[in-house]
């Protein structure tokens, strides 16, 4: 963990804060404009304070290396430690260091995406039904270890389908749905 990794991680944590405020918010790089971050870097534990610019809602994230986790909740705490790992692992709060080598959120390739609510999920599932109702078409899959799933995580709302939005010069905005599958241990 270094100061640059933590700065890039703070942008990802802004997106997690937006999901904590509204689990069905559309996430894209413009969400960063709604938040300010304050980083207190330390080798053992780094505190990242994410504050909403309008309502001043504050969330404090404690960031640890995977080798030295000593988590104690603080005021306005997110509720779980954020852990920088050496390789990709299960868990919404575990980010591999290779995710943090570049500023992925500000990249032009960073997608716009949203969690589908139960009504939209039922609509997608009904569209996937074939004529006889016995077989269903399947959506492309994505693993729960992908950064999009880590951002959209909410403990009380299971994530089944993620909708991606892509701009197309000819057709306008295209949508692409993907189903989330878990990784076996």
Curated annotation (Swiss-Prot):
Catalyzed reaction equations: RNA(n) + a ribonucleoside 5'-triphosphate = RNA(n+1) + diphosphate
Transcription found in the keyword field: yes
GO molecular function, one term: DNA-directed RNA polymerase activity
Record-linked Pfam families: Pox_RNA_Pol_22
EC number: 2.7.7.6
GO biological process: DNA-templated viral transcription
Family note: Belongs to the poxviridae DNA-directed RNA polymerase 22 kDa subunit family.
Oligomer status and interactors: The DNA-dependent RNA polymerase used for intermediate and late genes expression consists of eight subunits Rpo30/OPG66, Rpo7/OPG90, Rpo22/OPG103, Rpo147/OPG105, Rpo18/OPG119, Rpo19/OPG131, Rpo132/OPG151 and Rpo35/OPG156. The same holoenzyme, with the addition of the transcription-specificity factor OPG109, is used for early gene expression.
Function according to Swiss-Prot or TrEMBL: Part of the DNA-dependent RNA polymerase which catalyzes the transcription of viral DNA into RNA using the four ribonucleoside triphosphates as substrates. Responsible for the transcription of early, intermediate and late genes. DNA-dependent RNA polymerase associates with the early transcription factor (ETF), itself composed of OPG118 and OPG133, thereby allowing the early genes transcription. Late transcription, and probably also intermediate transcription, require newly synthesized RNA polymerase.
Designated name of the protein: DNA-directed RNA polymerase 22 kDa subunit
Originating species: Vaccinia virus (strain Western Reserve) (VACV)
Organismal lineage: Viruses, Varidnaviria, Bamfordvirae, Nucleocytoviricota, Pokkesviricetes
Gene: OPG103
């Amino acid at each position: 963990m270094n100061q640059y990794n933590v700065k890039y991680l703070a942008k990802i944590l802004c997106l997690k804060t937006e999901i904590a405020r509204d689990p069905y918010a559309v996430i894209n790089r413009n969400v960063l404009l709604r938040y300010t971050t304050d980083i207190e870097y330390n080798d053992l534990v780094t505190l990242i304070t994410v504050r909403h610019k309008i309502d001043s809602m504050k969330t404090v994230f404690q960031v640890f290396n995977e080798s030295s986790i000593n988590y104690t909740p603080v005021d306005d705490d997110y509720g779980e430690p954020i852990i920088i790992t050496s390789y990709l692992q299960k868990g919404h709060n575990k980010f591999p260091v290779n995710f943090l080598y570049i500023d992925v959120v500000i990249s032009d390739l960073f997608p716009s995406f949203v969690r589908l609510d139960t009504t939209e999920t039922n609509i997608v599932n009904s569209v996937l039904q074939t004529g006889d109702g016995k077989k269903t078409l399947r959506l492309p899959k994505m693993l729960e270890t992908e950064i999009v799933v880590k951002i959209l995580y909410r403990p009380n709302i299971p994530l089944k389908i993620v909708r991606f939005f892509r701009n197309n010069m000819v057709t306008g905005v295209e949508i692409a749905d993907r189903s989330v599958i878990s990784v076996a241990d």
